[in-house]
Swiss-Prot record:
This is Type II methyltransferase M2.LlaDCHI. InterPro entries: DNA_methylase_N4/N6 (IPR002941), DNA_methylase_N6_adenine_CS (IPR002052), RM_Methyltransferase (IPR001091), SAM-dependent_MTases_sf (IPR029063). Belongs to the N(4)/N(6)-methyltransferase family. Its EC number is 2.1.1.72. The gene is llaDCHIB.
Length: 269
């Protein structure tokens, strides 16, 4: 395949849904689109894949216990199907990641254990499991177990002895009063001021992505989000001077991401 076939951002074959100032959004199935990205062209990947809660799961909405139905994209019929889904997208993501690049994957207990196993099965070495401790989690209305107040973010690189991933150790110390940054990050859920462009069920706060991007990339690095949703990764990447590709199969979410990219990020450390 000739290099000039990757004419969008120098790394992408498919015409984008949105392209402006080093930020690209693509309306596509991630499995199909990942095959059209230049191999070993991404410096970092952040993914917030489906949690698969829409199969009888319960949630808190306005103080009421309600069933979870985020859409067909969040439904799965069995554990085997879920794990196969995770192995497939991680396998494709590995192909587009540079030899020294890293991947971050966020999730809850409903999916993160499958993700962790899939990462190792597909040739990754897990560097950290970050615990995001939420200061204002939704209450546990059933009173049958502990309140879910954390999510896990896995950070990994290719399991190759020659791999030399980037970590901005000094900057992370600076953000932590001169002390080593620990793997427990405490902060609030996404602020209302970041949700102005529309509703998404799992929108991540900008401060989480800012820390991730600053810790593991440099200016002008390429960042990929294969489940871009409302576009938080792209918004923060753009503000920090990184190049970005975001993929999503849901056009309604891409509309939100487009609005946010056109306006810019609202948060800064």
């Amino acid at each position: 395949m000739a290099i000039n076939e990757y004419k969008y951002g120098g790394v992408l074959m498919t015409k984008p849904y949105y392209e402006k100032e080093n930020a690209i959004l693509v309306h596509a199935d991630s499995f199909k689109l990942l095959e059209k990205i230049k191999p070993e062209s991404m410096d970092m990947i952040f993914a917030d894949p489906p949690y698969f809660l829409s199969n009888g799961g319960m949630s808190n909405s306005g103080g009421q216990i309600v069933s979870v139905d985020k859409g067909d994209w969040d439904k799965i019929s069995s554990f085997e199907e879920k794990h196969d889904f995770n192995r497939r997208w991680i396998r494709l993501a590995r192909l587009v990641l540079k030899p020294n690049g890293t991947i971050w994957v966020s999730g809850s207990l409903h999916n993160i254990y499958s993700v962790g196993m899939a990462l190792e099965q597909e040739g990754f070495k897990i560097l950290n499991n970050i615990t995001w401790q939420k200061t204002n989690p939704a209450p546990n209305l059933s009173c049958r177990y502990f309140t879910h107040s954390t999510e896990t973010i896995l950070w990994a690189r290719k399991n190759d002895k020659k791999s030399r991933h980037y970590y901005n150790y000094e900057l992370m110390k600076e953000f932590n009063d001169g002390k080593q940054m620990k793997d427990v990050w405490t902060g609030s859920l996404t602020k209302k001021s970041e949700k102005w462009a529309g509703k998404h069920p799992t929108q991540k706060p900008e401060y989480i992505l800012e820390r991730i991007i600053l810790a593991s990339t440099k200016e002008n690095d390429y960042i990929l989000d294969p489940f871009v949703g409302s576009g938080t990764t792209g918004v923060v990447a753009k503000r920090l001077g990184r190049k970005f590709i975001g993929i999503d199969s849901e056009k309604e979410y891409l509309k939100i991401a487009k609005k946010r990219l056109n306006k810019g990020a609202t948060y800064g450390l």
